[in-house]
Structures are given as C-alpha cells and as structure tokens.
Curated annotation (Swiss-Prot):
Organism: Enterobacteria phage phiX174
Role played: Self-assembles within the capsid. Upon host cell recognition, probably forms a tube that serves to deliver DNA genome to the host cytoplasm. This tube protrudes only at the time of infection.
Protein name: Minor spike protein H
Molecular functions per Gene Ontology: identical protein binding
Chief subcellular location: virion
Lineage: Viruses, Monodnaviria, Sangervirae, Phixviricota, Malgrandaviricetes
Record-stated family: Belongs to the microviridae H protein family.
Localisation: Virion
Length: 328
C-alpha cells in the first residue's frame, strides 16, 4: 500500500515539473525586460510591484497574510488527493466484488448463480429438503405431502382399531352365546330333574292316598271311588289340568271298576290289607293315565302322548290304556 502511494506521488511530481518547465506543450513567450517595463508578445506591463503581481497572478489575488504555496507542495497535494480518491474507489469496488463472489453472484451466468445458490442453501439448511429450500410453495407442497402421509397413517390406525373392536365383539358374543347355551342346558337339566323329582313325589303321595282310602273299611265302595276321584282331580287342578264332564265320567267308571277288583282280590286273600297297598298304585296309575294332561306330572309323557289320551276319553278308541284296564 505504501509503495503504491510513494510511486503515485513521484509520478505526479515528475509530471508537474515537466509541465511547468516546458509550458505544457506551448512555446515560450518571446520578449524580455526592457527598462522599467516587462514586455511580452501581447502587452507591456510596468515594473512596479502591483503591476508584476497582477500580470503574474491574474485577477485572483491571494491573501497577502498567507504564505504562497510552493510548486512542490501544490503538486503533492493534487497527487495525494487523486491517489486517495482512486484508492477509495478501487477499494470500494474490490470489496463489492468480493462480497458478490462470496455469495456466488459476481460476474457469473444465471445457471452458475442458481447452482451456487442451491449449494449455499443446502449447506446452510441441511435439515430442509430441496422443495423446502426452493421457497414457500415448495414448503407448502412438503406440508401437503406430510399431511397425506399423516392421513394415511390415521386411516390405517382407524381401520386396525375397527378390526380389533370387531374381533373383540365377535369373541364376546361367542362367549355370551356359550354361557347362555350352557346356562340353558343346565337350567333345562335342573328343570327336568326337579320335574322328575316332583313327579315321583306326587306319584308316591297319590299312591299313599289311594291306599289310605282303600284301607278305610268305614267307607263304602261309592265313597271310596268319590274320595279317590276328588283327591286326583284336586291334584290335577293344582297342576293346571282340567277335564271335561265326559272325561270325569269315564275316569270315575274306571276307578270304580278298579275298586271292585281290589275288594274282590282282598276277600280272596288272607292278607287283604297288604294287597290293598299293592293295588293302590294300580288305581293311581289308572286315574293318572286317564287324566290325560296330568300324565306330564306323573310320567313325563310329552304333549303328543297326552293328546292321544285326550282323544281316547272323547271317542273311547285308544290302545294300551294299561294292564289294569284289561281286568275290568
């Protein structure tokens, strides 16, 4: 830097000196000092101080209180001013060019500038993708794409959850159905067992009552038949079974025939009381079978069999009423 300044000053001094010596390429004035006047090609000036100063300095007369600048100082001032202005201008341009070069914009084509910009952004923002580094639109596109991915994941999660819920509901329904089926079977089994127990108990009670009636010697045959029918009909009504008048008449006839048979066999045997107990069950069976709907209570016969017995009491045409009836 200092070498450049010194060189500039020397060059300016040399140029100024030559210009002063040779008149800047103009011929020297002819003439000289003649007496008390200074003669030139154009005019004649008096030799007084004022005339000389006016002729040399022109109309711009310097302040007499200030020292007149020498030739060397004036030349150096001009050279320094020019050097400073040139240096500042050159420095500013160099700094600008350097800054442009740093960002990749100094004296390059549009393609090179774009490539440099992309490289710069990629190095400055490595966490962004190319679309996001390109600008707001690209960033929006990236956000939209991310939104699509999120929506896909959300939809997949919802479908998976629905599938799991459906499977859980299906398994729960299976378990409930299994529990209900097992409970129903158990309830049916318990009901059947209870019904069988009730039937056995009622059959036993019926037989005991018939035997008690038959053993009562104070009752006439008609009274025995009436008592047997009364207790059997009461038992049937308790079970919700009702008979028509025709059915009751037919049942009474059969019970009467059985009572006659019991009395006859009792008279023919030595131990009649024991025979009464044995045959009381036969009478109970006759009444039970004849009671049609009551057969569900005593024997557990289904509805079809009960209907068959009901039809028997209506038309008197049924097969296999019982072995007891064959003895009437």
């Amino acid at each position: 830097m200092f070498g450049a300044i010194a060189g500039g000053i020397a060059s300016a001094l040399a140029g100024g000196a030559m210009s002063k010596l040779f008149g800047g390429g103009q011929k020297a004035a002819s003439g000289g000092i003649q007496g008390d006047v200074l003669a030139t090609d154009n005019n004649t000036v008096g030799m007084g101080d004022a005339g000389i100063k006016s002729a040399i300095q022109g109309s711009n007369v310097p302040n007499p209180d200030e020292a007149a600048p020498s030739f060397v100082s004036g030349a150096m001032a001009k050279a320094g001013k020019g050097l400073l202005e040139g240096t500042l201008q050159a420095g500013t341009s160099a700094v600008s060019d350097k800054l442009l070069d740093l960002v990749g914009l100094g004296g390059k084509s549009a393609a090179d500038k774009g490539k440099d910009t992309r490289d710069y952004l990629a190095a400055a923002f490595p966490e962004l993708n190319a679309w996001e580094r390109a600008g707001a639109d690209a960033s929006s596109a990236g956000m939209v794409d991310a939104g699509f991915e999120n929506q896909k994941e959300l939809t997949k999660m919802q479908l998976d959850n629905q599938k799991e819920i459906a499977e859980m509901q299906n398994e729960t329904q299976k378990e409930i159905a299994g529990i209900q089926s097992a409970t129903s079977r158990q309830n049916t089994k318990d009901q059947v067992y209870a019904q069988n127990e009730m039937l056995a108990y009622q059959q036993k009670e019926s037989t005991a009552r018939v035997a008690s009636i038959m053993e009562n010697t104070n009752l006439s045959k008609q009274q025995q038949v009436s008592e047997i029918m009364r207790q059997m009909l009461t038992q049937a009504q308790t079970a919700g079974q009702y008979f028509t008048n025709d059915q009751i008449k037919e049942m009474t006839r059969k019970v009467s025939a059985e009572v006659d048979l019991v009395h006859q066999q009792t008279q023919n045997q030595r131990y009649g009381s024991s025979h009464i107990g044995a045959t009381a069950k036969d009478i109970s069976n006759v009444v039970t079978d004849a009671a049609s709907g009551v057969v569900d209570i005593f024997h557990g016969i289904d509805k079809a069999v009960a209907d068959t017995w009901n039809n028997f009491w209506k038309d008197g045409k049924a097969d296999g009423i019982g072995s007891n009836l064959s003895r009437k």
